Amino acid sequence: MAEKLSILLAQTNPIVGNIEYNRDLVLDTIDKNKSADLIVFSELILSGYPPEDLVLKSAFQNKVCDAFHEIMDASVHSNSYIVIGRPWKENEQLYNAAIVLYKGKVFHRHLKNALPNYGVFDEKRIFAAGNENSFFEIKGNKIGLFICEEIWDSDTYSKIEGEYCDLVITVNASPYEQQKIKKREDLAMLLSQKIDAPVVYVNQVGGQDEIVFDGSS
């Protein structure tokens, strides 16, 4: 039987390229919220969003990996499952990923399927696309994990048709524009109806160059 979960939505202000600062944001949040069953951070929090060409540099990727391993080590002392957005290299391909940590190990990973390539977004040039839905289980709860554009993409809804889960998490770096909050709410409601489960939506705040992130988690 599924148990109740306490969930922390970590709405933070990461900085593109400042990996040490972003790492410390994550570590501080974990340390101050030890009673949470699940801590959810925003899309690509370790690199900042949008990372653009920085993420193609091996030195940058190595720094992200170092910061990630520091967080992994710290998670040994936490009872929380921790969802972290980061660039992720696998089979010589670079992905936009959401990683679930628990007790010093990678418990689950999701590779973003739908890559936006319009307006301020340029992900297809930088990342490879994943190709599978992503579910994991905590305390008897089956949880679906999505990254930003996936809930805007019609293919996502055809792929999850008939799937069952207890909760959906979507991690985001979604910029502000007029009427954007209502659009997000409408999408979250559609996703909730399709999969018959509540939706947890986490976004970041702050500004990167000309892009403003309004949070609204």
Question: What is each PLM-predicted segment?
Answer:
Residues 1-217:
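Enzyme catalytic cores with a strong preference for nitrogen-chemistry domains
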